[in-house]
């Protein structure tokens, strides 16, 4: 049950972030990006050419 809730939570956060990115012109999580100065959404940073969450 906890795994299901965690997956549901992560999907919800991703969808909200993607909707936010369309509005503000930033790169959604897990999408390709170029360099450290890329505009990844929220607390995400460009790492290995993909927007990932900060540790």
Swiss-Prot record:
The keyword Signal applies. It is found in: Secreted. Disulfide bonds join 26-41, 33-46, 40-51. GO terms for cellular component: extracellular region. The keyword Secreted applies. Keywords: Calcium channel impairing toxin, Disulfide bond, Ion channel impairing toxin, Knottin, Neurotoxin, Secreted, Signal, Toxin, Voltage-gated calcium channel impairing toxin. Residues 1-21 form the signal peptide. One of its GO terms (molecular function) is toxin activity. Expressed by the venom gland (posterior main gland) (at protein level). Binds reversibly and blocks P/Q-type voltage-gated calcium channels (Cav). The presence of a 'disulfide through disulfide knot' structurally defines this protein as a knottin. Belongs to the venom Ptu1-like knottin family. This is U-reduvitoxin-Pr2a. It comes from Platymeris rhadamanthus (Red spot assassin bug).
């Amino acid at each position: 049950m906890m795994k299901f809730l965690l997956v549901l939570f992560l999907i919800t956060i991703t969808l909200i972030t993607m909707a936010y990115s369309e509005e503000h012109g930033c790169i959604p999580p897990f999408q390709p990006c170029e360099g450290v100065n890329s505009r990844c959404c929220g607390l995400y940073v460009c790492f290995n050419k993909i927007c990932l969450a900060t540790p």
